[in-house]
Swiss-Prot record:
GO biological process: flavonoid biosynthetic process
InterPro entries: CFI (IPR044164), Chalcone_isomerase (IPR016087), Chalcone_isomerase_3-sand (IPR016088), Chalcone_isomerase_bundle_sf (IPR016089), Chalcone_isomerase_sf (IPR036298)
Role noted for this protein: Catalyzes the intramolecular cyclization of bicyclic chalcones into tricyclic (S)-flavanones. Responsible for the isomerization of 4,2',4',6'-tetrahydroxychalcone (also termed chalcone) into naringenin.
Something else known: Part of the biosynthetic pathway for all classes of flavonoids, a large class of secondary plant metabolites, many of which are brightly colored.
Keywords for this protein: Flavonoid biosynthesis, Isomerase
Catalytic activity: a chalcone = a flavanone
Protein name as annotated: Chalcone--flavanone isomerase
UniProt entry tagged with the keyword Isomerase: yes
Transmembrane segments: none
Tagged with keyword Isomerase: yes
Pathway listed: Secondary metabolite biosynthesis; flavonoid biosynthesis
Originating species: Pyrus communis
Enzyme class: isomerase
GO terms, molecular function: chalcone isomerase activity
Length: 219
């Protein structure tokens, strides 16, 4: 087994993302692939809503290296296919979304659901099973509120489950709030961040830069 990737942690606004984390619902320690803000241009100002960190299982590096070794950070950051390979790859992923501005669970889940459904419809894979998974996703968030500094945590298993946790700060709890067994929903949550229309270009650039370095160091 290759030694785990050695990358530093990252600071995004007030949130410090550690270099590695053991996610809820997992027995593995994952490394920090990249992190960045999610924001929107509002009346000429860039308003930052959340800080997002994306962690990957160690075996992501050799698996991605087969196709992507030798590419520059810029080439990776502009490749829709590269991020699709991260989203659908057979390795665990963990996503930490920490709020910068206050957010209700309803606001968050409705926006994520909207992005997931739009993606599924664009690729023609929306079925009743996905509809039910979305209903469950919205239900999990219904009574939640996220003041600044609170976190929403997703663990994605390659087998298809999505483990959801909430934390009042940036710490990672051991127990899950919910587990949804739907592979397409699990992937779509990350797709909504890293995909072609992903909500965090900053996290995509960070992932591309850090992974380019790791992939090019692959033997």
């Amino acid at each position: 087994m290759a030694p785990p990737p050695s990358l530093a942690g990252l600071q995004v606004e007030a949130t410090a993302f550690p270099p590695s984390v053991k996610p809820p619902g997992s027995s593995n320690t994952l490394f920090l692939g990249g992190a960045g803000v999610r924001g929107l241009e509002i009346q000429g100002n860039f308003v930052k809503f959340t800080a997002i960190g994306v962690y990957l299982e160690d075996n992501a590096v050799p698996l991605l290296a087969v196709k992507w070794k030798g590419k520059t950070a810029e080439e990776l950051s502009e490749s829709v296919e590269f991020f699709r390979d991260i989203v659908t790859g057979p390795f665990e992923k963990f996503i930490q979304v920490t709020t910068i501005l206050p957010l209700t669970g309803q606001q968050y889940s409705e926006k994520v659901s909207e992005n997931c459904v739009a993606f599924w419809k664009s690729v023609g894979i929306y079925t009743d099973a996905e509809g039910k998974a979305i209903e469950k996703f919205i239900e999990v968030f219904k009574d939640q509120n996220f003041p600044p500094g609170a976190s929403i945590l997703f663990t994605q298993s390659p087998k298809g489950s999505l483990t959801i946790c909430f934390s009042k700060d940036a710490s990672v709890p051991e127990a899950a709030n919910a587990v949804i067994e739907n592979k397409l929903l699990s992937e779509a949550v990350l797709e909504s961040i890293l995909g072609k229309h992903g909500v965090s270009p900053a996290a995509k650039r960070s992932l591309a830069a850090r992974l380019s370095e790791l992939l090019n160091g692959c033997k």
